[in-house]
Amino acid sequence: MPTDVSSILNEVFHNLTEDKKHLLQIYLDLLFKWHKTSNIVSSSDKEYVIKREVYDSYKLTKFMRGQSYTDIGSGGGLPGIILAIFNPEKEVVLLDRKSSFIDFLELAKAELMLDNVNVVKQDFLVKDTQLMTDTVIFKNFSNKLISKMTYEEKFI
């Protein structure tokens, strides 16, 4: 069972270009480094995170429609950062209200040179028409907030 990020990436992603592998390696190194102090991902188990979180995020790319995406409650950038890496021609908005997550996302954006990413510190309940994108995604998001929304609000 491989334990280093590079070996796990090779095992999981069979046709990954060197460029994409390099970007994922940088991102994952940052993610696990920050996780030690900020708890920004579900697990410190690298193999689990890559196989379960990163690869699942990558698989979303074939289902995504439109030219722009908003990742609500982006946290550590999953799936938003992964979508941005594999879709450099698409705009990706990473939305979170926690300063520690925003700091990480800004650093990841800079380190990965992701010009297609816009990091926004804001609660998703604040309606901002400037943040309108073609597709909205979220994962590990509290149902309490969604359950308070009207039917129409869930699709706006």
Locations of the language-model features?
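Class I SAM-dependent transferase core
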Residues: 2-66, 104-115
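S-adenosylmethionine
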Residues: 97-156
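Conserved SAM-binding loop of SAM-dependent methyltransferases across substrates and taxa
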Residues: 76-89
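Conserved class I S-adenosyl-L-methionine
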Residues: 66-75
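Alpha-helix termini
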Residues: 52, 86-90, 126
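Conserved SAM-binding motif I beta-strand of class I
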Residues: 91-96
